[in-house]
Amino acid sequence: MTYELPKLPYTYDALEPNFDKETMEIHYTKHHNIYVTKLNEAVSGHAELASKPGEELVANLDSVPEEIRGAVRNHGGGHANHTLFWSSLSPNGGGAPTGNLKAAIESEFGTFDEFKEKFNAAAAARFGSGWAWLVVNNGKLEIVSTANQDSPLSEGKTPVLGLDVWEHAYYLKFQNRRPEYIDTFWNVINWDERNKRFDAAK
């Protein structure tokens, strides 16, 4: 298997005016692409690894040879994280979750607005580069953040929603205004896909 960029289900400018075309194009064709390239380089010569989906590699880092484990953690994580991120977005996004995910959020966090507040705080508080996540852990929802391209999958948690807070994800449009970028994220979330992912993760 050769790892490849996932096909985006929308054009680079489809999320305007929320997320700008230039950032989306650079983020996808440059940043995500280099993770895919470097992951393929890392597993080259390891046929037993190259046959596994990226998420499976990241979820089982202990099974990766030590000499390439760091590269798989970084670049496999970057590939898995960004693949989920793109699927989290939609030009017809926004609003709120429905169904089982809505019920689980309200059960765990109180209201949707209270959940948003806690998620925003996790994203804003991540020092330097990283991610904020809504994950399923032992059947329950949690909000966590990870550094760099570390994935919740490596901790046995299943990500449902992820927000990239590396500066490359927002700096061209928002400069140093990370909280504004975080607030804008809610306008483009594809809740239909998040609902499906939650149902599959339970």
UniProtKB/Swiss-Prot annotation:
Note on cofactor: Binds 1 Mn(2+) ion per subunit.
Reactions accelerated catalytically? 2 superoxide + 2 H(+) = H2O2 + O2
The residues that the entry says bind Mn(2+) are H27, H82, D164, H168
Enzyme Commission numbers on file: 1.15.1.1
InterPro entries found in the cross-reference section: Mn/Fe_SOD, Mn/Fe_SOD_BS, Mn/Fe_SOD_C, Mn/Fe_SOD_N, Mn/Fe_SOD_N_sf, SOD_C_sf
Q: What class of enzyme is it?
A: oxidoreductase
Per the record's keyword annotation, is Metal-binding included, yes or no? yes
Write out the coiled-coil annotation as residue ranges. none
- Return the similarity comment: Belongs to the iron/manganese superoxide dismutase family.
Q: How does this protein assemble?
A: Homodimer.
Protein name (Swiss-Prot/TrEMBL): Superoxide dismutase [Mn]
Species, as recorded = Listeria ivanovii
